[in-house]
Amino acid sequence: MKVRSRPRIVVIYNRDFEGAEADPENKAREDVKDVAQDVLRILGASGFETGELGVTNDIPEALSALVAMKPNAVFNLCESIHGDNRFESLMPLLMDLSNIAYTGSCPFGLSLALRKEKVKDILLGSGVPVARGGLVTCVGDCARLEIAFPAIVKPAREDASVGICSASVIHNQTALEQRVAYVLETYRQPALVEEFIEGREIYASILESVDGEPTVFPFFEIDFSDMPSDRPNIVSFEGKWVEDSIEYKGTRPVRCEGLSTELRACIAKTALNAFRAVGLRDYGRIDFRLSPAGVPYAIDVNPNCDLSDLAGGYSRAAKAAGLSYKELILRIVTLALTRHERASTIALHPAAAAVSADVPGAVILQREVEASAPRGGAGSA
């Protein structure tokens, strides 16, 4: 059997930001292509063979093309199909069936994370605090909710802050019913209604090692000090994606300071519990609202958080932990390669050696890759 001298990594990403299915909230999908190009550049410069596949709505064609490329692993950036992120798990499922290794969470974790009401139940059962609330499928359901105002209303099956704006935070029953009606009609899915937790918004980013041990990066939080007083302190869609908006300027990510050692440990432990409970893999981020009483309430579980270099909160946290963007991408690729049954036939060392030895964390990455290689050498069958 001929052993490939260099692993081939194919980067896949969704192309549903193009054409008729594009929508006004398209920015959240369109940025994925820029991330794909950054990843391809890093992998190519690090000694990997690379391939690129933009996934369209023709899934059989996409799978056939991917199989023909014979990747040793896939860097998965395919976050939606047909403009619908409910199909985020489809390509990972097909790759599992085709015995193709890929980065990130498995179909179960990806699908579950989009069922926000189910995630709340699982988190609650795992001892992770969540805001009181419920799923609403019609306006009439609002009357049965046992919540206190203010509350927040958001689409139950979206991510990337899609469907969240200043009007999402409501203060009375009439506003609740109006906002629920808007979500049901606009997004054609149930609405999730939760008590709004006043307090700091803190992000805990997590990265696994090749032995499966997760590490929590330094926390970041949102600085709302420049948010106008007539707007709620939330990260809306505009706050996340529209750079010239008031919300964007009022939601500045900063290092999380001023937490006691005990509270930091509590948030880290809670984040790891949430990561495991929802079935995330390789990397992810848990978002919290810290109540005035010091309770970290999990408000979102992100299996496919933004991996962009400059604007991405996840890469920002990795850099705070001493990992360069290049190291982060190589670490994630290594996780996929070492997980696959064919990893013993792949020469992993050149890619690891491409990481500069004077960059913090490079030695750790090298050791992880070496530990994953078979005793007889990286090229043994």
Q: What positions do the PLM features span?
A:
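Active-site nucleotide/adenylate-binding loops and adjacent lid/helix of ATP-dependent enzymes
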Residues: 2-13, 66-70, 111-192, 197-200, ...
